[in-house]
């Protein structure tokens, strides 16, 4: 019984890997970017847990920049993905332009709040 | 002719304004009204009155039931202090009564009341208004069978020799009174809840208050050192009152020998005791004034209208003591200033430069609001100082916070790395196939 679930998990993992290898490179680059943002956010949370939250506004600003970046990148990935029926009529340039503008606003806010 | 008369009356009515009198610049009393039962007191108490006039007081003697006496005329007080040496008066003459005496003290003037073994109800009422309760038994006197004064005839031990003085240099002077003080009269008690009265001379623990001519039928109500022979009251407006139960204490006295001790003093302690305590009552000693309250930020010299939290500021005040003729610097190491808003956030002892200038430096607390600089100084025998100056304190402005903190470098780093990552990502995203 355990052996079959172990084999099932392995089979699941293999199918996920092969399916993921089939995604277009563009989306893989966006996934990498999101992973980088989340990783940076995790580093900051661990730092705050060690040192304490003294300049709390700086902590919030740093974490929010990472989280905001990740969220905007995920939105871009959703809109650019050709397999997505909902955004079939949206030109990818329009999605990219939205992404750039939102990031500009995000970084403006972050710089103001960074202290 | 009418014009001449007019000018004459105008000129004479202006003369009282030029007389040197009681004022905040010169707090010692000058004009003293002495009410007596009969003018023989002038000669039997001549030493005491002589010591007063030699210090510059203008004494005016009147009989207590003289119909022309009055403390004030047209709303202005005619005298700076009142001395009641009339223990047996039933009704004051003129416009004086208990209410006017109480008003006189309430307006800041001083009072000396001396009762005696035949004290009337009126004098007892005046004393009760001042916070002191004489023994209710009208025939009682203070008797002490152990600390009486030795005399040539076999007395009934009502003349007692007492040396139980209060320990206060400001009230009794710095020189120790060697000889005991002779006292013959009624005793009084003080309410222990009253914080304004002080026992200057108390009876010894073997004294009691009873009628010397009759046998004791029940135990006396006033005994021991609860009996006060001489008390002083310093009111909240700094008026000073001296109350004692023996008019003969002020009279000219000779030597004294306490029973049970072999020392025979040539002179009793009465003269020194009464001189020193009169100096205190008439504000020749122990009268403080605080002037020149200033506060400013450390490093600047002008007084700001508002402080910011976590500012360093300095507070200074000058305190002087009246020496009888001039203002001398007051030197003490226990004057404190509070930075107060509902409760003191900062309490600091002021340091002095020995010339009457007190100052302290402290940091404004991390709380904003409207604060007060408060100095509340109440010490035994000194006038109370109550200074208060209001000052608001504001929080940081938006651009006054600390920037570039080393503790926040990781957060700065992550924000900038996110911006760099975004820039690189846009290039890669646009130019990858």
UniProtKB/Swiss-Prot annotation, chain A:
Its main location: endoplasmic reticulum. This is Dolichyl-diphosphooligosaccharide--protein glycosyltransferase subunit DAD1. It comes from Citrus unshiu (Satsuma mandarin). It is a multi-pass membrane protein. Component of the oligosaccharyltransferase (OST) complex. Residues 53-55 are lumenal. Belongs to the DAD/OST2 family. Residues 1-31, 77-94 are cytoplasmic. PANTHER family: DOLICHYL-DIPHOSPHOOLIGOSACCHARIDE--PROTEIN GLYCOSYLTRANSFERASE SUBUNIT DAD1 (PTHR10705:SF0). It is found in: Endoplasmic reticulum membrane. GO terms for cellular component: oligosaccharyltransferase complex. The chain crosses the membrane at residues 32-52, 56-76, 95-115. Subunit of the oligosaccharyl transferase (OST) complex that catalyzes the initial transfer of a defined glycan (Glc(3)Man(9)GlcNAc(2) in eukaryotes) from the lipid carrier dolichol-pyrophosphate to an asparagine residue within an Asn-X-Ser/Thr consensus motif in nascent polypeptide chains, the first step in protein N-glycosylation. N-glycosylation occurs cotranslationally and the complex associates with the Sec61 complex at the channel-forming translocon complex that mediates protein translocation across the endoplasmic reticulum (ER). All subunits are required for a maximal enzyme activity. The keyword Transmembrane applies. Keywords: Apoptosis, Endoplasmic reticulum, Membrane, Transmembrane, Transmembrane helix. The gene is DAD1. The keyword Amino-acid biosynthesis does not apply. Pfam families: DAD (PF02109).
